[in-house]
Amino acid sequence: MHISIVGITGYTGLELLRLALNHPHVTVSSIHATKEVGVQISDIFPHLKGIFDKEIQVFDSEFIMTHSDLVFFATPSGVAKDLSKNFVKNNFPVIDLSGDHRLSPDVYLKWYKKSPCTVDIQKRFTYGLSEVMNISHRNRFIANPGCYATATELALYPLISNHLIRVDSIIVDAKSGLTGAGKKLNQSSHYVNVNNNYVTYKLNKHQHIPEIVQTLQFFNKSLQNIQFSTSLIPVNRGIVATIYTRLENGVKINQIESTYKDVYKNKPFIRIKDGLPQLNEVIGTNYTDIGFVYNETTGVLTISSVIDNLIKGAAGQAIQNMNLMFNFDETDGLILAPLYI
Protein backbone atom coordinates (compact mmCIF):
# COMPACT_ATOMS: atom_id res chain seq x y z
CA MET A 1 0.00 0.00 0.00
CA HIS A 2 1.03 3.62 -0.49
CA ILE A 3 0.99 6.28 2.21
CA SER A 4 1.55 10.02 2.52
CA ILE A 5 2.89 11.82 5.58
CA VAL A 6 1.91 15.41 6.35
CA GLY A 7 4.21 17.12 8.84
CA ILE A 8 7.34 15.23 7.87
CA THR A 9 9.93 17.52 9.47
CA GLY A 10 8.79 17.14 13.09
CA TYR A 11 10.06 14.47 15.45
CA THR A 12 6.92 12.38 15.05
CA GLY A 13 6.88 12.73 11.27
CA LEU A 14 10.48 11.56 11.04
CA GLU A 15 9.78 8.59 13.30
CA LEU A 16 6.74 7.70 11.23
CA LEU A 17 8.90 7.76 8.11
CA ARG A 18 11.55 5.55 9.73
CA LEU A 19 8.97 2.94 10.71
CA ALA A 20 7.21 3.08 7.35
CA LEU A 21 10.46 2.51 5.46
CA ASN A 22 10.89 -0.78 7.33
CA HIS A 23 7.31 -1.96 6.88
CA PRO A 24 6.94 -4.96 4.53
CA HIS A 25 3.73 -3.70 2.91
CA VAL A 26 4.25 0.07 2.76
CA THR A 27 5.64 2.48 0.19
CA VAL A 28 5.94 6.16 1.12
CA SER A 29 4.51 7.96 -1.91
CA SER A 30 4.79 11.55 -0.75
CA ILE A 31 5.89 13.70 2.17
CA HIS A 32 4.52 17.15 2.96
CA ALA A 33 5.37 20.17 5.08
CA THR A 34 4.80 23.92 5.10
CA LYS A 35 8.52 24.71 4.96
CA GLU A 36 11.42 23.42 2.85
CA VAL A 37 9.02 22.59 0.00
CA GLY A 38 11.01 21.32 -2.99
CA VAL A 39 13.98 20.33 -0.84
CA GLN A 40 15.05 16.72 -0.52
CA ILE A 41 14.34 15.44 2.98
CA SER A 42 17.85 13.96 3.10
CA ASP A 43 19.37 17.42 2.58
CA ILE A 44 17.65 18.56 5.79
CA PHE A 45 18.25 15.31 7.66
CA PRO A 46 21.49 13.80 6.32
CA HIS A 47 20.96 10.53 8.19
CA LEU A 48 18.41 9.70 5.47
CA LYS A 49 20.90 10.15 2.59
CA GLY A 50 20.74 7.20 0.23
CA ILE A 51 17.86 5.72 2.21
CA PHE A 52 15.06 8.12 1.40
CA ASP A 53 15.71 11.16 -0.79
CA LYS A 54 12.24 12.31 -1.86
CA GLU A 55 11.45 16.00 -2.08
CA ILE A 56 9.10 17.63 0.37
CA GLN A 57 5.91 18.65 -1.42
CA VAL A 58 3.35 21.32 -0.76
CA PHE A 59 0.19 19.90 0.79
CA ASP A 60 -2.36 18.88 -1.84
CA SER A 61 -5.22 16.63 -0.76
CA GLU A 62 -6.20 15.72 -4.32
CA PHE A 63 -2.64 14.64 -5.13
CA ILE A 64 -2.50 12.52 -1.98
CA MET A 65 -5.83 10.82 -2.70
CA THR A 66 -4.65 10.02 -6.23
CA HIS A 67 -1.27 8.58 -5.25
CA SER A 68 -1.84 7.06 -1.80
CA ASP A 69 -4.17 4.77 0.13
CA LEU A 70 -3.82 6.50 3.50
CA VAL A 71 -2.65 9.83 4.88
CA PHE A 72 -0.96 10.41 8.24
CA PHE A 73 -1.08 13.81 9.90
CA ALA A 74 1.96 14.35 12.15
CA THR A 75 1.19 18.02 12.57
CA PRO A 76 0.85 20.39 15.54
CA SER A 77 -2.61 20.78 17.06
CA GLY A 78 -4.90 23.02 15.04
CA VAL A 79 -3.65 21.93 11.62
CA ALA A 80 -5.17 18.53 10.83
CA LYS A 81 -8.75 19.56 11.64
CA ASP A 82 -8.67 21.88 8.61
CA LEU A 83 -6.44 19.94 6.23
CA SER A 84 -8.31 16.67 6.75
CA LYS A 85 -11.74 17.95 5.72
CA ASN A 86 -11.46 16.94 2.06
CA PHE A 87 -10.29 13.46 3.00
CA VAL A 88 -13.25 12.98 5.33
CA LYS A 89 -15.60 14.28 2.65
CA ASN A 90 -14.25 11.68 0.22
CA ASN A 91 -14.10 8.87 2.81
CA PHE A 92 -10.34 8.62 2.32
CA PRO A 93 -8.51 6.97 5.27
CA VAL A 94 -6.86 9.32 7.77
CA ILE A 95 -4.74 8.72 10.86
CA ASP A 96 -4.33 11.95 12.82
CA LEU A 97 -1.49 11.92 15.35
CA SER A 98 -2.42 15.35 16.70
CA GLY A 99 -5.11 16.07 19.26
CA ASP A 100 -7.54 17.62 16.77
CA HIS A 101 -10.04 14.75 16.60
CA ARG A 102 -9.71 13.10 20.02
CA LEU A 103 -12.08 15.29 22.02
CA SER A 104 -15.59 16.62 21.59
CA PRO A 105 -15.46 20.13 20.09
CA ASP A 106 -16.44 21.95 23.30
CA VAL A 107 -13.81 20.12 25.35
CA TYR A 108 -11.17 20.67 22.65
CA LEU A 109 -11.87 24.41 22.66
CA LYS A 110 -11.56 24.56 26.45
CA TRP A 111 -8.25 22.71 26.69
CA TYR A 112 -6.49 23.49 23.41
CA LYS A 113 -7.73 27.10 23.15
CA LYS A 114 -8.26 26.66 19.40
CA SER A 115 -11.32 26.42 17.20
CA PRO A 116 -12.42 22.76 16.98
CA CYS A 117 -13.57 20.57 14.14
CA THR A 118 -17.31 20.11 13.73
CA VAL A 119 -19.27 17.61 15.80
CA ASP A 120 -20.12 15.60 12.68
CA ILE A 121 -16.47 15.22 11.69
CA GLN A 122 -15.26 14.44 15.21
CA LYS A 123 -17.83 11.66 15.54
CA ARG A 124 -16.47 9.97 12.43
CA PHE A 125 -13.07 9.51 14.06
CA THR A 126 -12.37 6.46 16.21
CA TYR A 127 -10.04 6.87 19.16
CA GLY A 128 -7.07 4.69 18.26
CA LEU A 129 -5.97 3.09 21.53
CA SER A 130 -5.00 -0.04 19.64
CA GLU A 131 -5.24 -2.64 22.41
CA VAL A 132 -8.62 -1.44 23.64
CA MET A 133 -10.73 -0.03 20.82
CA ASN A 134 -10.90 -3.00 18.41
CA ILE A 135 -9.61 -1.11 15.38
CA SER A 136 -10.43 -2.90 12.11
CA HIS A 137 -11.05 -2.41 8.39
CA ARG A 138 -14.37 -0.80 9.31
CA ASN A 139 -12.54 2.24 10.65
CA ARG A 140 -11.63 4.93 8.10
CA PHE A 141 -10.59 7.75 10.43
CA ILE A 142 -8.37 7.32 13.47
CA ALA A 143 -7.59 9.86 16.18
CA ASN A 144 -4.26 8.54 17.43
CA PRO A 145 -3.95 8.89 21.23
CA GLY A 146 -1.52 11.24 22.92
CA CYS A 147 1.67 9.95 24.50
CA TYR A 148 0.82 10.62 28.16
CA ALA A 149 -2.68 9.33 27.52
CA THR A 150 -1.43 6.08 26.01
CA ALA A 151 0.84 5.23 28.95
CA THR A 152 -1.82 6.16 31.51
CA GLU A 153 -4.85 4.58 29.86
CA LEU A 154 -3.16 1.25 29.17
CA ALA A 155 -2.11 1.05 32.81
CA LEU A 156 -5.56 1.89 34.18
CA TYR A 157 -7.98 0.37 31.66
CA PRO A 158 -7.96 -3.22 33.00
CA LEU A 159 -8.48 -2.06 36.58
CA ILE A 160 -11.04 0.65 35.79
CA SER A 161 -13.15 -1.53 33.51
CA ASN A 162 -13.22 -4.37 36.05
CA HIS A 163 -14.00 -2.05 38.99
CA LEU A 164 -10.92 -3.11 40.96
CA ILE A 165 -9.76 0.34 42.10
CA ARG A 166 -11.39 3.36 43.65
CA VAL A 167 -11.86 5.83 40.83
CA ASP A 168 -11.82 8.79 43.22
CA SER A 169 -8.28 7.99 44.36
CA ILE A 170 -6.24 8.14 41.14
CA ILE A 171 -3.08 10.26 41.10
CA VAL A 172 -0.82 10.19 38.03
CA ASP A 173 2.72 11.56 38.08
CA ALA A 174 3.96 11.42 34.48
CA LYS A 175 7.42 12.28 33.20
CA SER A 176 8.45 12.75 29.57
CA GLY A 177 11.62 13.03 27.57
CA LEU A 178 12.24 16.27 25.71
CA THR A 179 10.94 15.13 22.32
CA GLY A 180 7.51 15.12 23.92
CA ALA A 181 7.68 18.91 24.03
CA GLY A 182 7.98 19.03 20.23
CA LYS A 183 10.54 20.58 17.94
CA LYS A 184 9.50 24.22 18.21
CA LEU A 185 11.98 26.41 20.08
CA ASN A 186 10.76 27.09 23.58
CA GLN A 187 12.31 28.57 26.70
CA SER A 188 11.10 25.65 28.81
CA SER A 189 12.93 23.10 26.65
CA HIS A 190 16.13 25.13 26.20
CA TYR A 191 19.21 22.99 26.95
CA VAL A 192 20.36 24.98 29.96
CA ASN A 193 16.88 24.80 31.49
CA VAL A 194 16.45 21.04 31.19
CA ASN A 195 19.94 19.58 31.44
CA ASN A 196 20.60 18.31 34.97
CA ASN A 197 17.14 19.54 35.88
CA TYR A 198 13.59 18.37 36.54
CA VAL A 199 10.80 20.64 35.32
CA THR A 200 7.12 20.26 36.18
CA TYR A 201 4.83 22.01 33.70
CA LYS A 202 1.15 22.46 32.85
CA LEU A 203 0.13 21.26 36.31
CA ASN A 204 -3.62 20.51 36.20
CA LYS A 205 -3.73 22.06 32.71
CA HIS A 206 -2.27 19.46 30.37
CA GLN A 207 -4.45 18.76 27.33
CA HIS A 208 -4.17 14.99 27.82
CA ILE A 209 -6.17 15.18 31.06
CA PRO A 210 -9.61 15.36 29.39
CA GLU A 211 -8.50 12.73 26.87
CA ILE A 212 -7.65 10.29 29.65
CA VAL A 213 -10.84 11.03 31.58
CA GLN A 214 -13.01 10.75 28.46
CA THR A 215 -11.50 7.38 27.54
CA LEU A 216 -11.66 5.83 31.01
CA GLN A 217 -15.21 7.11 31.58
CA PHE A 218 -16.26 5.05 28.56
CA PHE A 219 -15.45 1.95 30.63
CA ASN A 220 -16.46 3.19 34.07
CA LYS A 221 -18.99 5.99 34.33
CA SER A 222 -18.18 6.52 38.02
CA LEU A 223 -14.84 8.13 37.21
CA GLN A 224 -15.16 11.92 37.29
CA ASN A 225 -11.57 13.15 37.19
CA ILE A 226 -7.96 12.34 37.97
CA GLN A 227 -5.08 14.23 39.56
CA PHE A 228 -2.47 14.47 36.82
CA SER A 229 0.96 16.10 36.76
CA THR A 230 3.50 16.27 33.94
CA SER A 231 7.24 16.86 34.11
CA LEU A 232 10.17 17.01 31.70
CA ILE A 233 13.23 14.90 32.40
CA PRO A 234 16.60 15.29 30.64
CA VAL A 235 16.33 12.33 28.26
CA ASN A 236 15.47 12.41 24.56
CA ARG A 237 12.71 9.79 24.56
CA GLY A 238 10.35 8.05 26.86
CA ILE A 239 7.46 8.42 29.25
CA VAL A 240 7.18 7.06 32.77
CA ALA A 241 3.70 7.26 34.26
CA THR A 242 3.65 6.49 37.98
CA ILE A 243 0.10 6.00 39.20
CA TYR A 244 -1.13 5.87 42.80
CA THR A 245 -4.55 4.48 43.66
CA ARG A 246 -6.47 2.38 46.19
CA LEU A 247 -8.19 -0.95 45.77
CA GLU A 248 -11.95 -1.27 45.98
CA ASN A 249 -13.21 -2.93 49.15
CA GLY A 250 -12.69 -6.67 49.08
CA VAL A 251 -10.26 -6.68 46.14
CA LYS A 252 -7.09 -8.74 46.68
CA ILE A 253 -3.73 -7.93 45.14
CA ASN A 254 -3.62 -11.24 43.25
CA GLN A 255 -6.71 -10.06 41.35
CA ILE A 256 -4.70 -7.12 40.00
CA GLU A 257 -2.03 -9.36 38.51
CA SER A 258 -4.47 -11.89 37.08
CA THR A 259 -6.61 -9.14 35.55
CA TYR A 260 -3.67 -7.48 33.81
CA LYS A 261 -2.49 -10.80 32.40
CA ASP A 262 -5.97 -11.85 31.31
CA VAL A 263 -6.88 -8.55 29.63
CA TYR A 264 -3.57 -8.26 27.78
CA LYS A 265 -2.81 -11.96 27.14
CA ASN A 266 -3.20 -11.66 23.36
CA LYS A 267 -1.79 -8.14 23.04
CA PRO A 268 1.72 -8.40 21.56
CA PHE A 269 2.85 -4.91 22.58
CA ILE A 270 1.83 -5.02 26.25
CA ARG A 271 4.27 -6.63 28.67
CA ILE A 272 3.27 -7.15 32.31
CA LYS A 273 6.45 -7.17 34.37
CA ASP A 274 7.17 -9.14 37.52
CA GLY A 275 8.80 -6.04 38.98
CA LEU A 276 8.74 -2.37 38.03
CA PRO A 277 9.63 -1.53 34.41
CA GLN A 278 12.56 0.58 33.29
CA LEU A 279 12.54 3.21 30.58
CA ASN A 280 15.52 1.82 28.66
CA GLU A 281 13.69 -1.49 28.20
CA VAL A 282 11.14 0.11 25.84
CA ILE A 283 13.11 2.88 24.10
CA GLY A 284 13.04 2.33 20.34
CA THR A 285 10.05 -0.01 20.53
CA ASN A 286 6.26 -0.11 20.39
CA TYR A 287 6.01 -1.85 23.76
CA THR A 288 4.19 -0.70 26.86
CA ASP A 289 5.72 -2.23 29.98
CA ILE A 290 3.55 -2.22 33.10
CA GLY A 291 4.43 -3.21 36.65
CA PHE A 292 2.94 -2.59 40.08
CA VAL A 293 3.64 -2.77 43.82
CA TYR A 294 1.11 -2.82 46.66
CA ASN A 295 1.88 -1.23 50.02
CA GLU A 296 0.13 -3.26 52.71
CA THR A 297 0.79 -0.55 55.29
CA THR A 298 -0.76 2.40 53.45
CA GLY A 299 -3.16 0.47 51.23
CA VAL A 300 -1.80 2.22 48.13
CA LEU A 301 -1.30 0.45 44.79
CA THR A 302 1.54 1.97 42.77
CA ILE A 303 1.54 1.25 39.04
CA SER A 304 4.37 2.12 36.66
CA SER A 305 3.81 2.30 32.90
CA VAL A 306 6.66 3.08 30.48
CA ILE A 307 6.64 3.74 26.74
CA ASP A 308 8.71 5.37 24.03
CA ASN A 309 6.75 8.58 23.46
CA LEU A 310 7.68 8.79 19.77
CA ILE A 311 6.79 5.18 18.99
CA LYS A 312 4.06 3.68 21.18
CA GLY A 313 3.05 7.21 22.14
CA ALA A 314 2.81 8.38 18.52
CA ALA A 315 4.25 6.90 15.29
CA GLY A 316 4.35 3.25 16.35
CA GLN A 317 0.76 3.21 17.53
CA ALA A 318 -0.21 4.94 14.28
CA ILE A 319 1.45 2.14 12.28
CA GLN A 320 -0.22 -0.41 14.56
CA ASN A 321 -3.59 1.17 13.80
CA MET A 322 -2.80 1.17 10.09
CA ASN A 323 -2.03 -2.55 10.29
CA LEU A 324 -5.38 -3.20 11.94
CA MET A 325 -7.26 -0.99 9.46
CA PHE A 326 -5.76 -2.70 6.41
CA ASN A 327 -5.81 -6.29 7.69
CA PHE A 328 -2.05 -6.65 8.01
CA ASP A 329 -0.56 -8.50 10.93
CA GLU A 330 -0.73 -6.15 13.92
CA THR A 331 3.02 -6.44 14.46
CA ASP A 332 4.15 -5.80 10.87
CA GLY A 333 7.00 -3.29 10.83
CA LEU A 334 6.97 -3.03 14.62
CA ILE A 335 9.01 -5.96 15.93
CA LEU A 336 11.85 -3.83 17.25
CA ALA A 337 14.35 -4.73 19.95
CA PRO A 338 14.84 -1.99 22.56
CA LEU A 339 17.86 0.26 22.09
CA TYR A 340 18.58 -0.36 25.80
CA ILE A 341 21.99 1.33 25.80
UniProtKB/Swiss-Prot annotation:
Pathway involvement of the protein, from the record: Amino-acid biosynthesis; L-arginine biosynthesis; N(2)-acetyl-L-ornithine from L-glutamate: step 3/4
Keywords noted in UniProt: Amino-acid biosynthesis, Arginine biosynthesis, Cytoplasm, NADP, Oxidoreductase
GO CC annotations on file: cytoplasm
Pfam families in the cross-refs: Semialdhyde_dh, Semialdhyde_dhC_1
EC identifiers of the protein: 1.2.1.38
Residue numbers annotated as active site: C147
GO molecular function, a single term: NAD binding
Major location category of this protein: cytoplasm
UniProt catalytic activity: N-acetyl-L-glutamate 5-semialdehyde + phosphate + NADP(+) = N-acetyl-L-glutamyl 5-phosphate + NADPH + H(+)
UniProt cross-references to SMART domains, sorted A to Z: Semialdhyde_dh (SM00859)
GO-annotated biological processes: L-arginine biosynthetic process
Localization terms from the record: Cytoplasm
PROSITE patterns: ARGC
NCBIfam families, alphabetized: argC
Reported function: Catalyzes the NADPH-dependent reduction of N-acetyl-5-glutamyl phosphate to yield N-acetyl-L-glutamate 5-semialdehyde.
Membership in a protein family: Belongs to the NAGSA dehydrogenase family. Type 1 subfamily.
PANTHER family, per database record: N-ACETYL-GAMMA-GLUTAMYL-PHOSPHATE REDUCTASE, CHLOROPLASTIC-RELATED, N-ACETYL-GAMMA-GLUTAMYL-PHOSPHATE REDUCTASE, CHLOROPLASTIC-RELATED-RELATED
Official protein name in the record: N-acetyl-gamma-glutamyl-phosphate reductase
Organism: Staphylococcus epidermidis (strain ATCC 12228 / FDA PCI 1200)
Biological classification of the source: Bacteria, Bacillati, Bacillota, Bacilli, Bacillales
